[in-house]
Amino acid sequence: MRAELNQGLIDFLKASPTPFHATASLARRLEAAGYRRLDERDAWHTEAGGRYYVTRNDSSLIAIRLGRRSPLESGFRLVGAHTDSPCLRVKPNPEIARNGFLQLGVEVYGGALFAPWFDRDLSLAGRVTFRANGKLESRLVDFRKAIAVIPNLAIHLNRAANEGWPINAQNELPPIIAQLAPGEAADFRLLLDEQLLREHGITADVVLDYELSFYDTQSAAVVGLNDEFIAGARLDNLLSCHAGLEALLNAEGDENCILVCTDHEEVGSCSHCGADGPFLEQVLRRLLPEGDAFSRAIQRSLLVSADNAHGVHPNYADKHDANHGPALNGGPVIKINSNQRYATNSETAGFFRHLCQDSEVPVQSFVTRSDMGCGSTIGPITASQVGVRTVDIGLPTFAMHSIRELAGSHDLAHLVKVLGAFYASSELP
């Protein structure tokens, strides 16, 4: 089971270079399992025992498995994750012609580590909006092959490179995508037009706009002398999306189960399809349109907010509290912060520990050092937006927000098992 889950994750990461592609990948799995797509623009007709999913902006998704009992009686079991990761996004007018090379101007999305982006074989993917035959359309594109690189400056020309050299995002991150002949001009939108034709057989009248991100073409892999680790891009947080989907599709029981995978977490979640927007609440209210039904059901519900945690790095162990250092392959981590950067409280943490113990899954705790700041997740945002009790958890990871992150190869199976137990749980605290 562990090897199969890990290979499934590797395949999912390869198919999901952007939030748009991740959402499409999730939707394909759901449809293959018998889930029916609901369109927010239409009237909905749902029924007990039904299987449904909803997307918004092509980059966020909510999957719904309705049980036989009403949510007014048993509530919802929700698992939340996010589809986005830090990356380099192409600017609207990106062409930069310098010294005979064509580069593309990029904007940093989220809190990316810059240095790992150098000397990588990069490709480009995302969503393109265009006009064809007088009609406005959008399609996902993925160049797949390596088309760009950000070469490092040789140390002979930068002797301070290993002494904490700061990287200027504006000047040093534009990737090189081609060499130009003297006097040659380049139009990036024409390249997109050609890609639409190759990938979709569409000839666009004009490419109007796009949301495109560079990504590393190196596939994720199981690594380590004893295959202890998984290395790959976008583990934060497609690892949790994949675990949530596997748990939902394979969970026993007949409860009301929800998987929420939203975009824009890395930039604050404040969008119409992010966790700080109305997406989840609007979907739940449409499932419970009568009077105070939503408010009553949500107070019987619980959210597991799943987002990667910082594992104790052997070279930097002093960055952790000595008593709260999560180990890779040590199981899911309960995240706790007294200042509500995480939404966990004693009741929700206790319930998650109980699930882990009953499932024979190891569990760990994470608290930041008292002299360091703490990141946050969709947990507090969703809790405050919807009013749902929440526990923040995640799998321990190294190199978070790098172009290539590292997680334990045993931990995915741990997380899928306990999330499956959560979905199947007949009683919530």
Curated annotation (Swiss-Prot):
InterPro entries: M18_aminopeptidase_2 (IPR022984), Peptidase_M18 (IPR001948), Peptidase_M18_dom2 (IPR023358). One of its GO terms (cellular component) is cytoplasm. Its EC number is 3.4.11.-. Its cofactor is Zn(2+). GO terms for biological process: proteolysis. SUPFAM superfamilies: Aminopeptidase/glucanase lid domain (SSF101821), Zn-dependent exopeptidases (SSF53187). It comes from the Bacteria. NCBIfam families: PRK02813.1 (NF002759). Belongs to the peptidase M18 family. This is Probable M18 family aminopeptidase 2. It comes from Pseudomonas aeruginosa (strain UCBPP-PA14).
